[in-house]
Amino acid sequence: MAIFYLAVQSVRRGEGRSAVAAAAYRAGEKLDDERTGETFNYTRRRGVVASEVIGWQGDRSSLWNAAEAAENRKNSVVAREIVIALPCELDDVRRAELVKSFAHWLHSRHGVAIDYAIHSPDKDGDQRNHHAHLMVTTRKIEGGRMGAKTRELDQKQHSRKHIEAWRSEWAAICNRALALGGTDTALDHRSYLRQAEPFGAVPLEPQKHLGPSETRLNRKGRMTAKAKQNAWARAVNKGLHQTGRLFGRGLVRGMNAMIDAAGKENLRER
């Protein structure tokens, strides 16, 4: 079943990261970083289903080298990255259309360039884990060049409302596609807490996102702390659903035994 997942992170020079290196890895390409003289070759990387640059007249190399050249500070944020889960109910072509549509929407809203790469599930991981990485410039593209900074995304008090809009738009794009495909699933970008508030109900327990390495460990029976927390959340949510209504955290009591049972199951984490 499709799930909603959208996370945003920054590519910071002060952490030793490079936008060129990140782009090369995401797209599975070989790129030269003109600022450092390094070459990043990920052409042997597997699992890249599709990739494209939106809102920039040049190629991937020229985009991210221009982004790096535009920043002079040692601790500059040279790119933003949005990671999204893609509906497993759709095929590769339809998933690519969704990501491209979202990238164009971001470009129109903020005037930035977007470089996206769609990845297939890891061979040893959850086979529903289709996802995409969208690298976003921290500057607007003006006259085919790096222009003004996207200040609306730099200030925390303002960036939150924009990220909320991103989440809402991505959910809407997915839901339209799922409905056209005849799927009953509908994604909700809101947190469980916000979903429950209008009804005065107790929200479902949220689960933590697990990366590929943690997923592999859990499949081998070595549960990480986040996996244990997810098992607890699933046990709680199962109890809440079985009541037919969400009416109190008292249901949590007595569920510890269910956690052990959940840990013995083949965890299917994203």
Predicted regions and their residues:
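N-terminal nicking endonuclease/strand-transfer module with a His-rich metal-binding environment
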Residues: M1-R270
